[in-house]
Amino acid sequence: MSAKSAISKEIFAPLDERMLGAVQVKRRTKKKIPFLATGGQGEYLTYICLSVTNKKPTQASITKVKQFEGSTSFVRRSQWMLEQLRQVNGIDPNGDSAEFDLLFENAFDQWVASTASEKCTFFQILHHTCQRYLTDRKPEFINCQSKIMGGNSILHSAADSVTSAVQKASQALNERGERLGRAEEKTEDLKNSAQQFAETAHKLAMKHKC
């Protein structure tokens, strides 16, 4: 089982929540924490997770999850409601940077994702979730690549595929309709020709009868 699957099962499933995405991160600038506050737990892995509740009305949240060295379990740390997210900074709109910042109402963190592609995927999911579940105040996405906001997004590609399929089906139906229309015109012409032939034959028959 992957780390993200384990996080979803251990952290979110018991609370009837569904994890939409996660990104493994490290701080770009380490916070100065007193030794006693760390509890001597040593090194750890950090994940930023995005989840939603299964119950309506749906609530979305961002959670910081940690896995300490030597442990197979995960620990829920800080959590923010999606409404508290104010700004998402992609750092570099022109390149594949793994760095990003998250600004909340009461917190600001500077992160580096494990890979630029993992960050990109998480950003796409985060942007889509904000558009779907936030109606009033949406966070600002700055210094982000265009593929995160639209065009090449993995979330939009599926919609584009569906749209393309619908357009092709519509075109096929239109072409079929045109063919049927032409067939109906030919049928009508044949019908008129048959009527004219019948009338001519009737006139000839009457003429010879006379």
UniProtKB/Swiss-Prot annotation:
Detected at low levels in brain, and at very low levels in heart, adrenal gland, testis, liver and kidney. GO terms for molecular function: cadherin binding involved in cell-cell adhesion. Residues 151-210 form the v-SNARE coiled-coil homology domain. Its main location: cytoplasm. GO terms for cellular component: adherens junction; cytoplasm; membrane. It is found in: Cytoplasm; Membrane. It is a peripheral membrane protein. Keywords: Acetylation, Coiled coil, Cytoplasm, Membrane. GO terms for biological process: negative regulation of exocytosis; regulation of SNARE complex assembly; SNARE complex assembly. The modification N-acetylserine is found at S2. It comes from the Eukaryota. Part of a ternary complex containing SNAP25 and STX1A that can be dissociated by NAPA and NSF. Interacts with STX4A. Forms non-fusogenic complexes with SNAP25 and STX1A and may thereby modulate the formation of functional SNARE complexes and exocytosis. PANTHER family: EXOCYST COMPLEX COMPONENT 1 ISOFORM X1, SEC3/SYNTAXIN-RELATED. This is Syntaxin-binding protein 6. It comes from Homo sapiens. The lineage of its organism: Eukaryota, Metazoa, Chordata, Craniata, Vertebrata. The gene is STXBP6.
